[in-house]
Design a protein with these regions (language model features):
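Short, flexible turn/loop "capping" segments at secondary-structure junctions
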Residues: 2-3, 49
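Active-site-proximal beta-strand elements of phosphoester/diester hydrolases
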Residues: 4-14, 18, 95, 107, ...
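Active-site metal-binding loops of divalent metal-dependent hydrolases
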Residues: 12, 45, 111
Length: 141
């Protein structure tokens, strides 16, 4: 790592409601930026698009999404942030994640749901705040 924090904001086409295709696509984009970035930020609900079909599109923490992100972070030696539709204890959340190459994991459930898109009718609001310091990921090892 360098003394400067190198961030890649990845905004690209999301294949609607196709987790497997999106994971493959974004995995390839992360491979391309590896070695040139410390933190890759993926789009909101990057695995499915901003779907309201939460029962069909949600993934659990043990499902396909989180283990794949952990693998990317370790393999490409970069932190990865973004969000996905999560199912947890029978509820659905727009869950943000921040996973480091060293395996540190942080999660935040969106608290202020977008009423105009009826997000509040399909998702549960989070009840905790999360504040992270990014200083440690830019420090030389």
């Amino acid at each position: 790592m360098t003394e400067d924090l190198r961030i890649s904001m990845i905004q690209s086409h999301i294949i609607w409601e196709d987790r497997e295709e999106n994971l493959g696509y974004y995995g390839e984009l992360l491979r391309r930026v590896s070695g040139r970035t410390d933190l890759a930020v993926l789009p909101e609900t990057f695995t499915t698009g901003f779907s309201m079909d939460v029962e069909k599109q949600a993934d659990t923490m043990e499902g396909q999404t989180v283990p794949t992100i952990k693998e990317w972070a370790k393999k490409y030696k970069l932190a990865v942030a973004g969000s996905f539709i999560a199912k947890d204890n029978g509820k659905f959340y727009n869950r943000a994640f921040f996973i480091t190459p060293e395996g540190e994991e942080y999660y935040y459930d969106k608290r202020h749901l977008f009423r105009m898109a009826e997000e509040d009718k399909h998702f549960s609001a989070g009840d905790k705040r999360l504040i992270l310091s990014l200083i440690h990921i830019s420090q030389p090892t």
